[in-house]
Amino acid sequence: MAVGDSDLQGYDEAQKKMMNENCIIVDENDKITGQDSKVNCHLGNGKLHRAFSVLIFNSNEKLLIQQRADEKITFPSIWANSCCSHPLYQDGEEEGIEGAKKAASRKLVQELGIRPNAIRTEDLNFITKMHYKARADEKWIEHEVDYIFVVKIDVEIDPNPNEIQKTQYVDEEELNDLFDKANGNDVKIGPWFRLIKDNFLSKIWRNLESIESINDNEVHHMGEVE
């Protein structure tokens, strides 16, 4: 689907351009079955594709979270983890964990303005994968096998305003307070971030000094969520 098609009319030009990038289509066991544009992967009922979520903790063990820009086509303005996006069907990004790490490194620069190689692929600790589906609205959907990565590092950020409108470092109590506000509809939380928090984050926080000890290569099937 080309930029300029009716489904993308009225959206931000930079965001529209990225919707023509090709995602990696997979089955529920994360086996590659093909490729298709981000538009086709997220429109209507969507197509199951790979994604990644990075959790950046500083030396005080506070988690970097972001509020997505209003310009985002799917899930604009919601709060999410440090960085989340998609491996593309290019440049070796389709090569499982290592490919997802390459994609994460690319987006850490493009979204958060982190200096290239300030966070290397080998710094990213793979935790697990989760399969979920969540509607953004009547038009757009997420249906992903999401690779979760953790890194503990102090790093300078310069967020891209076309991607991110706000960032914040939070401890576990502060994050719980944010989620409580979301339960009262005062703020909105990305459904993938809620799944990470509800299923993995407390264990990650408790094991930041031995993070390699809690990884697995399972695909955790979460079903359809709000």
Q: Over which residues does each language-model region extend?
A:
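Nudix hydrolase/Nudix homology domain
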Residues: 1-7, 83, 125-226
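Acidic, metal-coordinating catalytic segment for phosphate/diphosphate chemistry
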Residues: 10-60
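Short helix-to-loop capping/linker segments positioned immediately adjacent to catalytic or ligand/cofactor-binding
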Residues: 93-95, 111-118, 133-139
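A short coil-to-beta-strand element that immediately follows conserved catalytic motifs
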Residues: 116-128
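Conserved Nudix-box catalytic region and its N-terminal flanking loop in Nudix hydrolases
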Residues: 13, 39-53, 62-110
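Secondary-structure boundary elements
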Residues: 57, 113-118, 156-160
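Short loop segments at secondary-structure junctions
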Residues: 29, 58-61, 69, 91, ...
